[in-house]
């Protein structure tokens, strides 16, 4: 995996997410060839400067709608999946045609949440993208809409792009949209709305500044704020800028690469969500939080909360569990709740039935209650992540973790 750049040439790993509105006309669903060409030129320029670039591209469903001459996206999931099957091939073919003009090879990477639910699959996905970058290829990532079922979908490519950026330890995630930046209010309806240029804490941003997502896509400003939170928590700088001006990416990166940040350079309007330098989520913890679907929840008491949040934190013992919700098996992910609020995720060693029997009990009682004792912990420390407390983001993903 490409490490964070520390050398003087300041090359970066950059993920660029393109929404449907940046790829196809919202009404006719015709591909916006001129805009796509500008994006291709920008990516190739970034590559020539030594940066690694990954595209996360929406547009498969819109391309399918155009090919089948359908007026709008249907609500039935199976119909959407069929349309995606028609459009995805046409979308990647269009990208390949445009990139080929500049002799830039690309690769299609289709992902579902199920593909990264197992740790080994998550590592393989990250390593595959890493190898593509090593070969000088531009990976083009999209959710596999043809296979994803509602329960395990990422839901939108903003989320997918943030997970991809965290998975490959990217430096920047650019979310290209139909507005220049985040505003204090909707600029389409309020002429007094002010641009917000830099944000250090995503929790301080009011999602009511949002603009509506397109009728074809599933996004909107709310999903971008969620993506910004995911990205910055894993050490990725997240930037929102206008998709019709992709060259702004080049200008922003060039400014970030400059040794003189104070020089007077007029940059295009954009919003920069600054990466968290403290409390960044480690790779394994990022996978636990965002790669896995929660199958239930555990409520814990104050003693357990203090034990798992202290500096030399411990694993979760059964004595600290007060309630069990849902039906899940051993080795599945669950939400951890304290005082009615989600505080993190855990990969449990026992099923919901087993934990319900041993909750509130000391570990030495497990064998007498269950008839066996797999481990004294409900969840090991390394498979327990608490929001905002897990630091030291791994520099790379490898397959030899223990």
Curated annotation (Swiss-Prot):
It is found in: Cytoplasm. Pfam families: AA_kinase, PUA. Keywords: Amino-acid biosynthesis, ATP-binding, Cytoplasm, Kinase, Nucleotide-binding, Proline biosynthesis, Transferase. Substrate binds at residues 58, 145, 157. GO terms for biological process: glutamate metabolic process; L-proline biosynthetic process; proline biosynthetic process. SUPFAM superfamilies: Carbamate kinase-like, PUA domain-like. Its main location: cytoplasm. Pathway: Amino-acid biosynthesis; L-proline biosynthesis; L-glutamate 5-semialdehyde from L-glutamate: step 1/2. CDD domains: AAK_G5K_ProB (cd04242), PUA_G5K (cd21157). Its EC number is 2.7.2.11. Residues 295-373 form the PUA domain. Signal peptide: none annotated. It is an enzyme of class 2 (transferase). GO terms for molecular function: ATP binding; glutamate 5-kinase activity; RNA binding. Catalyzes the transfer of a phosphate group to glutamate to form glutamate 5-phosphate which rapidly cyclizes to 5-oxoproline. Belongs to the glutamate 5-kinase family. This is Probable glutamate 5-kinase. It comes from Schizosaccharomyces pombe (strain 972 / ATCC 24843) (Fission yeast).
